[in-house]
Each structure stands twice: as structure tokens, then as C-alpha cells.
Amino acid sequence: MMRKTTILTLTLSLLSSVQLWAKDYRVSDFGAVADGTTLNTRALQRAIDVIHEEGGGRLIFPLGRYVSGTLHLRSGVTLHIESGAVLLGSNNPYDYDREPGLNTAFLLARGQKNIGVTGEGLIDCRGRQTAYNLVDLIHRGLVDDRLGLDRPNESIRPMIFYFRECDGVTVEGISLKNSASWVQTYDQCKNLKIDRINVESNAYWNNDGLDIVDCENVTVTNSYFDASDDAICLKSHSGAHMCRNILIRDNVAR
């Protein structure tokens, strides 16, 4: 009896600690400006890093328009985009990170745990203009790409999400719009939940709505996909991995 009581007490203590860590932070507290023109990458990345270092929580985006380049999502951090809030992707291709082994994206994560994007707001990456600007840089010799099929390789055009080798991912309620490439890619991720999202992406070539690559334990439910390429696509890029335990139910795709 004493052992059971000790275990229960320890469990409740741990749950209490998790609740204390899971605080809400507002982007304005880190200097983000919601005017639709100011580049907020540095302020937003600092906010994500601080929340991660403090043990996790939600970064709240209230009503407004927030421009940013690539953001790196960290373990324990959820971006919560409220109704009326819009995250706008920068139209400058140089504002997006290019790292070995990772595709270019507005929101990047690799090897992170318990991350998410939630709320009733919108992420609009304005991909058509960003892709056109990238083509211009290639023609001027400032970016190296052979322009196969008269368009930049999809790996250097920014997706909205690229999450790789992450465990415990929640994407819920939000709208995603106008990627310059695939909209969202989850590569070798585990325990992924996608629910009640709205995807409208007809901005450019290769506008897949959702790509699930070598993932395990995935649910995709109650969502809408309007994409100019594959709406929902399961893939494998590695001989050592495969898609396993995937549930896709009650969605609309066109």
C-alpha cells in the first residue's frame, strides 16, 4: 500500500509540474509587430527558444499579420494562432534557411518532441511570389539551380512545414495556404495527429496538400485539402523505414 501511495504521489507531482511548465506566452512580449510588413523572424525565434528553455508552453499569436522567414520549432513548444491572426511567409527567398538534409520551409523541426501548431488562424506563405523571386535569383546567377521543367527544384522552394524525425506532433484547427512547394511534410515522424485543418494551396507547382513520409502512428481526420497536386500522399524515401499504422478518415480532398 505504501508503494502504491508513493507512486501515485510521484505521478501527481509530475503532472502538476507539467501543468506549471505549459505556460502561455504572447508574441508581443518578444517584440513581434503585427503590421504585415515588419520581418519578425528574429523576435519569433527568440520566443520559441525561450519557451523551450523554460520547459515548454504555447506561443500565442493574437489578431494581426506577422511576417517571418524560417522558424525552427523546439521541443515542448506549440504555436497557437488565434482567429484573425495570420502568419505571412516572407517573399524574400534569402529569409528561408537551407540546411543539409532538410528541405526549405517556413516552419522547420528535426528531432524534436511534443511540438504543435494549433488555433483557428492562418499561415499564408505567399508562395507564388516567393517562387517567382527565386526564379529571378537563379537567372541572375545568385542561386544555383538548373531550373528543370522551367521551375526551381521543390527542395529549395519553401514548404510551410517540414518536420523530420519528430515524436509527438499535433496540428489542429489551423488553415494553411499558398505554399511554394509541398504544403506540409512529415518525414520519419512518430505519433502525429492532424485534425480539423484547412489546406488551400494552388499557388505553384508541386503543391501537395499533405505528405506523410516513413511515419508511424498517424491520424489525419476531419480536414479539407484543396491542392494543385496530390491532396494526401504517403511516401517512403528510405529503405530502412516505412509508413506504419496510418489512419486517414472523414476528410475532403479535391
What are these regions (language model features)?
Residues 7-8, 49:
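Short amphipathic alpha-helical "recognition" segments used for binding
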Residues 6-7, 22:
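Intrinsically disordered, low-complexity segments enriched in glycine/proline and serine/threonine
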Residues 21-254:
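Extracellular/periplasmic carbohydrate-active domains that bind, remodel
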Residues 9-17:
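Bacterial N-terminal signal peptides
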